[in-house]
UniProtKB/Swiss-Prot annotation:
Name this polypeptide is given: Pre-mRNA-splicing factor cwf22
InterPro entries hit by this protein: ARM-type_fold (IPR016024), CWC22_splicing_factor (IPR050781), Initiation_fac_eIF4g_MI (IPR003891), MIF4G-like_typ-3 (IPR003890)
Domain MIF4G, residue spans: 124-307
Segment forming the signal sequence: none
Compositional bias (Low complexity): 618-662, 691-712, 747-762, 769-791
Main localisation: cytoplasm
Any GO molecular function: RNA binding
Comp. bias intervals (Acidic residues): 368-394
Segments of skewed composition (Basic and acidic residues): 677-690, 717-726
UniProt-listed SUPFAM superfamilies: ARM repeat
Domain MI, chain residue ranges per copy: 411-527
Taxon lineage: Eukaryota, Fungi, Dikarya, Ascomycota, Taphrinomycotina
Amino acid sequence: MEKEDKSFGIGMLDYNRENPESSGHSRVAVIRKQKTEQENNNLSWEDRHYIPDLHKSNKIKTPTSLADEKKSHNELDPKAQIKKLMETRSGGTYIPPAKLKALQAQLTDVNTPEYQRMQWEALKKSINGLINKVNKSNIRDIIPELFQENIIRGRALYCRSIMKAQAASLPFTPIYAAMTAVINTKFPQIGELLLTRLIVQFRKSFQRNDKSMCISSSSFIAHLINQKIAHEIVGLQILAVLLERPTNDSIEIAVMLLREIGAYLAEVSTRAYNGVFERFRTILHEGQLERRTQFIIEVLFQTRKDKFKNNPTIPQELDLVEEEDQITHYISLDDNLDVQESLGIFHYDPDYEENEKKYDAIKHEILGEEDDDENEEDEEDSEETSESEEDESVNDEKPQVIDQTNASLVNLRKSIYLTIMSSVDFEECCHKLLKIDLPEGQEIELCNMVIECNSQERTYAKFYGLIGERFCKLSRTWRSTYEQCFKNYYETIHRYETNRLRNIALFFANLLSTDSIGWEVYDCVRLTEDDTTASSRIFLKIMFQEIVEALGLKSLVERLHDPNLVPYLHGLFPVDEARNVRFSINYFTSIGLGALTEEMREYLLTMPKSEPKEQDSEGYSSGSETGSTYSSSYSSTYSRGRSYSRSTRSYSKSRSYSRSRSVTPINNINHKKYIRKDRELSPRGRERSSNRNSYSDLSRSSSLSRGRSRSYTPEGRLIESEDKGYRSRSSSPASRKYRSRQRYRRSYAGSTSRGRSFSRSPSYRRRLSMSCSVSYSRSPSPAARPISRSPARNKRSYDSLSYNRQYSPKVSRKRSNESRSPSPYTLRKQKTYHLNKRNEDFVVKMDKKGSESPVILAPWLREVDDGELYKDRNSESDSVRKQPRAD
């Protein structure tokens, strides 16, 4: 307080000396003195130094002084204002936008330092604003705006702004690196300057033990390495420095750096990559670090085990530069580097206007001339609208020109072909093909071109299969397109030669084995002799063999038993006719896939026989009905037959010999007395088809003998006729609908007894040559031995031998070899045993673990009921099968 009073007193003395007139005792002076003392008491000690000038600020401004001040303000020199900005390195004080525009309007001379300084400040603000706005979504829009600015002049400004922004927000480091990668392709000096400054910044921060600055600079360098702006040797040198004398902080920085560049190092420098991890393992085993740091290293090893799935080299949305366009700078950590600090300070440019024109030319080359034409287009919009309205009326009147040469389609195929051939791997090819602007509805052309290029190769290349697989898994549209291609190529596969056919089959086999297309495409395949060609069968063979090689036979069988695929496999495994079933079985067996046909083999044995169609012919008849012209005998129509019969009763033997060679017209028979309609029964044995063998004439004619005969009509009616002979029951064999040779035939004849006979019908040539057929029959002899007599001859009876002869034209006589074969029932039983044995072997082979599960019935055969198949046929033959044998 004493100092304040003393200073206050000194101030008052000085005040009285400067104003001698106030020393009077006038009233005005006293009032002024009191007022001054009151104001001084309210001021602080620092403000009391300005007390002598306080009275000047309290002077009332007159209107004339205000006008003069306003006039002087309006007449400020813009150069003087700009000079204030140039005095300081930071750029001076803030200038309001309105005042800045006024200054810029007054500065029109380009070659003045003031104008260039204003443009420098504007460039710095523009670059800084664009860098602060960039993110993943708008990076493609920010980069063209950045090229609009003269970043060659402001390259130091760009480096300073982006380093400052990256240090403030580390998660945006990949974005800043991607933007720098694009700029580096056009202006490599900018990328080199940024990398140089980052390396120098890391060295300084490492020497100062500035952890935050080390993390930011090393992180930025890591992403520049991923973008291939910097060589990987810089990252390895930084890791070596950090791991030479490991501390908790250096290990943390090294782990962060390796996590960012680990995926890239694993590709380009595997040896150094493994060496770094060995160093980490050694440090971890030493155990001199904190528990937290050890845990960080363990997490790094887990990241390596996961192949850096959370730290990709370049994120997909930031992959903006082609690999061959990038420029890599080989700068080492130990080099003498120049950061060029002077580039960040304003310098007067005497050739400012010329340099700006040069950059405009470069900008036009990079961005094109679209930006320059925007203003002109805006001015011409009004004129174009008026002209377009007039042109529309004229264009409506002109006829449309349709290009019939398909020039656009040819150009599209050419571009697709060149794209495929210029690609290194399938991923690059798919990426380029997706960028092609396909017209609507022309997607199938791309698929066709991929298949055609594949077919042109000398051998199948998996490159094309991977392309088709990738497209099918991209969207459902491409999958349906390739499924349509499968149907189209299967229908036209006969147009391709064998080598091209093989490549196409392997291509679709790859798509099917990887489930790229659905197996429903087999709906278009019908595997029959009439519906397939040699090319289509080769196509299916190659495709199925490739699928078996990819999936395995067991997986293929399980896939074909999938209930969802059953409606689409009826054409591949037909069950409509026996010949189609047999063809499918033989086809798959011949290509080594007989395991697919095990169920069809069983089905073929039990499948229902189709009803025979009644056919009339001159020489051959399926039954001895009244509508037939001739009555067929046991052998051919024109034949000479011998029969030997041996019957035993009471240990007595008898032989009968009969020979007949005539054609007996049915018209000569008394229809009132002899009425016969045969019911045909299919033989129980399996028929074997042979195109070379002739038809078997196996229908039977009625025996004109005395006795009582009983026969069944096809409708199931029983017709009896009485005669003075024995009673006979007969049944005709199957018709000749299928041209097959029947080896065995069962007949039942004799008086009140049933026997077993084995007969073999002559071949077609033998019938033409009218040769003989020999049949043997053995049956128990009845009490009264009736003898069949021909109506054209007198009836003679012998106890031991009967000889009947009918006259016919002379023909050559030939005897066939005598043979005796097992019954059809025995053959069927043996065949069923072998099939069951083979099925058991197949199940054991399919299940290597030894679990013999029952054979899975094919889904396309489940609808058949075996009971219904056997019901009708067994009912007819059970009565015969249950009869005890007489001998």
